């Protein structure tokens, strides 16, 4: 496994914002161990009507979208970047411990999230907020909520104020429209990779080997994916989806049909396993027809009924449910 890739998992883009923080405070990507503290901080602000509350399940499933600041093991602030499509992402769940407000923590988190958006290749980032002055200082400009595409309202449907939202909409255009270079080898997925990822996955889905993926699903879950790229083209991909503090699923592992059997899928799975360890997950599982392939990495077959019910959420959309003919395989990390 490329050590540079592992190092990249340990730091949030925009760590130069560290200089904005109080002495001893650390800006970094969230990990599984942060889930309970993130939920508590977000819901403290939600109880005051400042943002939507988050269930622990929602926090764990979106843990890679979060950046946090901590000091001596205490969470000082958090914020998340959620992709909406190839041209738009949202900053959400931005919360700072009241004891640390005004210390530059919120600004450092937002600047890190914007740096992440630039690296992914997202040209615009918006926020729905009551803190318009704060976002204006960071280069955001106000817009009418009606100017935002309808797809961003999915999350808002759960809000008690919907459709009479009283938050202001702010948006910023980012200078780097292309994202980081599409380097050859195994790496985290970028916005520009999604069309080719969809083509590869849906080719195998048409043959009954996995679930199909809509572009909207791939954009919203882009942080789950790794790809193997060659000459700026995706030839393999796969995702690690966090389900809870103790379990993640390897899914959508697919290789371009003309490149199967050359080790590209293995390279992606190795990256997914390494990321699972870096996040702090104790166990991974996969539903698969490829027993031999996953056995190479230490996965073992288990009874499907031994897995918790929460793993079946996505299966409800499968035409084979509940008569699944895939094997359940697990790996203890």
Where does each model-flagged region fall?
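Short amphipathic alpha-helix that is part of the acyltransferase structural core
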Residues: 5-52, 70, 167-169, 176-211, ...
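Short active-site oxyanion
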Residues: 25-26, 119-125, 184-185, 278-284
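Hydrophobic adenine-recognition pocket in adenosine-nucleotide-binding enzymes
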Residues: 30, 94-96, 189, 253-255
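A conserved beta-strand-loop-helix scaffold within acyl/acetyltransferase catalytic domains
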Residues: 53-65, 71, 77-94, 211-225, ...
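Conserved acetyl-CoA-binding loop-helix of GNAT-fold acetyltransferases
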Residues: 96, 102-115, 127, 255, ...
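Conserved active-site alpha-helix within GNAT-family acetyltransferase domains
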Residues: 123, 129-157, 282, 288-315
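C-terminal "cap" of GNAT-fold acetyltransferases
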Residues: 148-183, 307-333
């Amino acid at each position: 496994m490329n050590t540079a890739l592992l190092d990249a998992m340990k730091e949030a883009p925009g760590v130069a914002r560290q200089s904005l923080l109080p002495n001893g405070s650390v800006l970094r990507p969230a990990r599984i161990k942060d889930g309970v503290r993130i939920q508590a901080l977000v819901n403290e602000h939600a109880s005051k009507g400042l943002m939507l509350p988050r269930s622990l399940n929602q926090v764990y499933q979106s843990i890679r979208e979060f950046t946090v600041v901590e000091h001596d093991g205490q969470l000082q602030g958090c914020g998340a970047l959620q992709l909406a499509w190839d041209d738009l992402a949202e900053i959400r769940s931005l919360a700072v411990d009241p004891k640390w407000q005004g210390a530059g923590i919120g600004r450092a988190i937002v600047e890190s999230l914007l740096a992440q958006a630039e690296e992914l290749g997202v040209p615009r980032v918006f926020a729905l907020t009551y803190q318009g002055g704060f976002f204006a200082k960071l280069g955001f400009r106000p817009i009418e909520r009606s100017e935002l595409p309808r797809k961003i309202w999915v999350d808002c449907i759960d809000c008690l104020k919907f459709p009479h939202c009283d938050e202001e909409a702010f948006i910023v255009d980012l200078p780097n429209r292309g994202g980081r270079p599409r380097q050859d080898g195994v790496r985290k997925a970028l916005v520009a990779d999604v069309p080719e990822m969809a083509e590869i996955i849906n080719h195998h889905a048409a043959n009954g080997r996995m679930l199909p993926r809509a572009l909207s699903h791939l954009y919203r879950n882009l942080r789950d994916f790794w790809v193997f790229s060659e000459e700026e083209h995706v030839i393999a991909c796969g995702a690690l989806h966090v389900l809870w503090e103790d379990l993640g699923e390897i899914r959508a592992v697919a290789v371009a049909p003309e490149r199967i059997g050359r080790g590209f899928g293995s390279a992606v799975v190795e990256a997914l396993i390494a990321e699972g360890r870096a996040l702090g997950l104790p166990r991974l599982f996969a539903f698969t027809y490829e027993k031999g392939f996953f056995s190479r990495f230490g996965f073992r077959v288990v009874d499907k009924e031994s897995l918790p019910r929460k793993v079946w959420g996505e299966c409800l959309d499968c035409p084979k449910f509940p008569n699944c003919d895939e094997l359940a395989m697990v790996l203890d990390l």
